[in-house]
Amino acid sequence: MYEPDDKMISLIRDNYNLLQSLGSFGISLGFGDKTVKQVCEEQKVDTYTFLAVVNFTINGNSYLEDVSKLSVPTLLQYLRASHAYYIEFQLPFIRRELMDALDENDSLAKLIMKLYDEYARSVTTHMKYEERNVYPYVEALLEGKVAGSFEIDMYSKHHSQESTKLRELKSIIIKYLPSDGLHNNQLSATLYDIYNNEEWLALHAQVEDHIFIPAVRRLEQKSKQSDVTAKISNMISKNQEGTEALGEREKDVIVALVQGMTNKEIADHLCIAVNTVITHRRNIARKL
């Protein structure tokens, strides 16, 4: 587990794959011997969120001490930049590698390119769907807007660890690798890159499933609670004509009761004593 006081350069020495993640978080190199916390604060990246992603992708640690500490804007920046990296750089890069390693007149080479292009289209379509639908929905939640009937769980089951097209592609390359040295070496290197990118994509999907989606679920819950609070407050105000007015704290207690909280939970939520909650409830009963 990496901590805020660990040196950033130590993380990179332990796992050079972190270099791409740094770019997606918007962290530039040249940070000397500064700690993770120092680098994140200087480059305006949320430290807790950065370490949550790093500890998950490097150490496989999916335990989140406190989902409420996650910065959803930081996660959105990371995911968007990761998509741009994969669509604009990695997919075209591997395609060029395949083109250089294959004989364009060979029928098997044409099949390999066809399978790769289908895979690339599928991945791009999925990522563009997230860009057009999921991320704007999350931004609306951040702004306190209730965005229609869409919920994050509708999207959370869409990931698969490996595309069928990519599996077929790897199988063909492995089975029918050309015998001449140059093309064999080129295609072997490309196959290695394909495996690396497949692993990267699987980790990316897991970050969405285990870190991003729980953070968005919490946003949804807060949004629903705020909506309920507003409706109840409005209802209370309308029903108080000619009666003794309820205090703001008493209104808070009513909202908490409607949400199903116990006296103890209300006390913790409002930072007051349980006896105070009971007193408020008696006053509410008298006034209403």
Per-segment meaning from a language model:
Residues 1-233:
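Small-residue-biased structural context
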Residues 230-276:
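Helix-turn-helix DNA-binding segment
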Residues 286-288:
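Short, Lys/Arg-enriched C-terminal cap helix and immediately downstream tail that follows
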Residues 280-283:
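Residues within the DNA-recognition helix of helix-turn-helix
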